[in-house]
Amino acid sequence: MIKFNIRGENVEVTDAIRAYVEDKIGKLDKYFNDGHEVTAYVNLKVYTEKRAKVEVTLPAKNVTLRAEDTSQDMYSSIDFVEEKLERQIRKYKTRMNRKPRNAVPTGQVFGDEFAPLDTTDEVAEDHVDIVRTKHVALKPMDAEEAVLQMDMLGHDFYVFTDADSNGTHVVYRRTDGRYGLIETE
């Protein structure tokens, strides 16, 4: 069963919007096994130019699904995000079935409610071509210093060792121009 955490920025999350989100995104519940509890983090934003942005993140075991859409109509953005998430689930399951690994089998996360996507036309798209490998020495520093290093290098992310916890972290530049921090466990 999917639980919902719905937030609104510059918009009141009315009962009608909440019901619509829960109905549309709730349809994805059929793709998850009964034993897995998933929380959908939904962020609804309205900008001054009357554009609506919908962001949905579904963290599941070994995979995090995320989709967003911006349009003039909040409801059509919700529809489009639901379609994107469904496609991600199907594509993920197809890839995992094609390349068996030591990871969790997809049947343990996603149920067998649907057939895998026919991706004969997308084989080239699925191929990952790593064109460069870098080896870096991680320096102990705090997040602020890592952001400064990232900016000096002109990169969108920077991997570093946190001086306090000794853990490997990543700072990154978000699409809104602010910064994010990923802390590994």
Curated annotation (Swiss-Prot):
Keywords: Cytoplasm, Translation regulation. GO terms for cellular component: cytosolic small ribosomal subunit. Pfam families: Ribosom_S30AE_C (PF16321), Ribosomal_S30AE (PF02482). Transmembrane segments: none annotated. GO terms for biological process: negative regulation of translational elongation. Its main location: cytoplasm. It is found in: Cytoplasm. Residues 1-125 are annotated as: Probably still associates with ribosome. Disruption phenotype: No visible effect on growth until cells have been starved for 5 days; cells recover from starvation less well than wild-type and are dead after 14 days starvation. No 100S ribosomes are formed even in stationary phase. One of its GO terms (molecular function) is ribosomal small subunit binding. Residues 126-185 are annotated as: Required but not sufficient to restore ribosome dimerization, in vitro will replace E.coli RMF in ribosome dimerization. Belongs to the HPF/YfiA ribosome-associated protein family. Long HPF subfamily. The N-terminus (residues 1-126) is homologous to YaiA and HPF of E.coli and can associate with ribosomes, while the C-terminus (residues 126-185) seems to be a functional paralog of E.coli RMF. Required for dimerization of active 70S ribosomes into 100S ribosomes in stationary phase; 100S ribosomes are translationally inactive and sometimes present during exponential growth. Able to dimerize E.coli 70S ribosomes in vitro. HAMAP family: HPF (MF_00839). Interacts with 100S ribosomes in stationary phase; alters the relative position of the 30S and 50S subunits. This is Ribosome hibernation promotion factor.
